[in-house]
């Protein structure tokens, strides 16, 4: 998702964005800004997304652990009622949990 803005400015009709399940309004707003040519607005949204992306995709590509971190972020933001994950995936703990919590709070949830 760090490449979302860069991809959109190349010209797209849409995209499949997993992160949109967490922040659909912001992803749509980013797309709208790009379509209108409001690159400053788009950059502002991208900068807002970045700490959340870093907390969720801490170790790179999406994985079971990244999905668990996404669920925790969605739970902490009030978008999910539960953050239950199935084995063998584990919920984030310790510093990983704190990083997600800080990012969610920093985003204003």
Task: Please describe what each predicted stretch is.
Residues 19, 59, 89:
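Glycine- and other small-residue-rich loops at beta-strand/loop junctions that grip anionic moieties
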Residues 10, 33, 73-76, 103-106:
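Alpha-helical structural signal in soluble globular domains
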Residues 78-109:
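Flexible C-terminal active-site loop/helix
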Residues 40-79:
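Shared catalytic-loop signature of beta/alpha-barrel
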Residues 32-33, 60, 87:
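Short, flexible active-site loop motifs that bind/organize anionic cofactors or intermediates
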Residues 4, 71, 101:
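Short glycine-/small-residue-rich flexible loop motifs, especially phosphate/cofactor-binding loops
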Residues 1-53:
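Catalytic alpha/beta core domains of metabolic enzymes, predominantly
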């Amino acid at each position: 998702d760090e490449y979302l803005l860069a991809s959109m400015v190349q010209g797209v009709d849409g995209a499949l964005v997993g992160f949109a399940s967490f922040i659909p309004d912001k992803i749509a707003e980013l797309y709208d800004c790009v379509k209108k040519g409001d690159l400053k607005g788009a950059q502002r949204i991208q900068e807002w997304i970045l700490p959340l992306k870093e907390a969720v995709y801490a170790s790179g590509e999406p994985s079971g652990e990244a999905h668990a971190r996404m669920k925790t972020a969605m739970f902490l933001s009030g978008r999910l009622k539960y953050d239950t994950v199935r084995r063998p995936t584990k919920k984030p703990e310790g510093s990983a949990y704190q990083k997600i919590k800080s990012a969610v709070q920093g985003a204003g949830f």
